[in-house]
């Protein structure tokens, strides 16, 4: 999916690794008026953007080595909980996108409903709870041949989408919402991998 969106203008350089990636795989930060590093998940805040690969260890390194301050040539404060703040913001964004899919009728939730959609050829993005039972996840993944699968959010987080206590399986129909959700889940995965 990412190759469809990549153009020369969409690439940024990570301030930690120096690696050049598409901004869909990165996180933007700006320095606020109080000289603090502020995550810009929506990429809309004013100011010079400082880009990092969407990975926990890269943000840790940027904070530890004061790379935000070095890039803007002044003292920049980074909160101790910046990594957790970014993870929470990305998780919230993913849940919001799933709720938008639900409101627009593009979300199918529940194991039997998702299985039925997959067997009928409805494709999109399969979202599975990261803490779901391995046997059940394997069964549903086997039906999803050729369908992108993300397993980043917990069942409790997925449950928030429908007001349930838990949700393990969800399918977002092909479209812009599925593409945006895939991007955000990919960025969140960089903060949740072991």
Give the role of each language-model region.
Residues 21, 57-59, 131-134, 156-157, ...:
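Conserved nucleotide-binding/hydrolysis micro-motifs of P-loop NTPases
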Residues 57-131:
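Extended interfacial segments that mediate partner engagement and assembly in macromolecular machines
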Residues 48-49, 104-105, 122-125, 144-148, ...:
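Short active-site oxyanion
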Residues 1-74:
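N-terminal cysteine/histidine-rich coordination modules
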Residues 145-189:
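Short basic, glycine-rich beta-strand/loop surfaces that mediate nucleic-acid
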